[in-house]
């Protein structure tokens, strides 16, 4: 990481059993009446989901789904008071998915289907944050509203293409998406706090003909960090509503007991082929 008064730059990398990636990020603070900045970021990543979820590493598990995510983004943001900011950006992404249509196939003799997305994006994001801790807050609130416009091209190549049967599908795609995230913590005396959480996602994205391709690329609701590492089709949809509560007890200033419960409501109809099983 480099930092010089108004300029910051960083190069980061991650390596793990199911995920690895790299990010190059740089930001410069602009000399304007309202505090503002311009930034550029580039990300290259690969994530694998296995046929069976295991807590510890096992190299004998077949890779059921592989996601590649490569994108470049330019951003401009400015402050709104001391607790809020507005951000606008444009970007380009090359996304690639490789997957099996079923998890009951012979992984050694069956090839994976293959989809690619070449997408341009515009984004606007508003954030207001008064939480007293980035990971484990006990007071304050946070509201984030994100609007995205996407256009590009989708290509589906079935595994049968490797066997000499050409059946590639191409489709132009354009859609809009809005996401709202709300978190707020209410004190209930000196020791008890009740947190509330609401996540709403709405999208105009149309479904493609392949069920698994839709599910693999659909946004996922991840209530905990651990859920980001395994594939659950019941937590994926182009539009959803999630609401939850976070009861917590403050033992001392830097020690707390907290738990969380949430309910997820999915929207959107996916046509499931009879041979697909999860």
Q: What would you call each of these model-derived segments?
A:
Residues 1-131, 219-221, 233-241, 255-259:
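Gram-negative/organellar outer-membrane beta-barrel architecture
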Residues 23-27, 50-58, 98-106, 137-139, ...:
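Outer-membrane beta-barrel translocator domains and adjoining extracellular loop/strand segments
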Residues 46-48, 94-96, 151-153, 202-206, ...:
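Feature marks short, surface-exposed loop/turn motifs that line or immediately flank catalytic pockets
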Residues 112, 119-252, 257-262:
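C-terminal outer-membrane beta-barrel translocator/porin domains of Gram-negative envelope proteins
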Residues 256-277:
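C-terminal/domain-terminus segments
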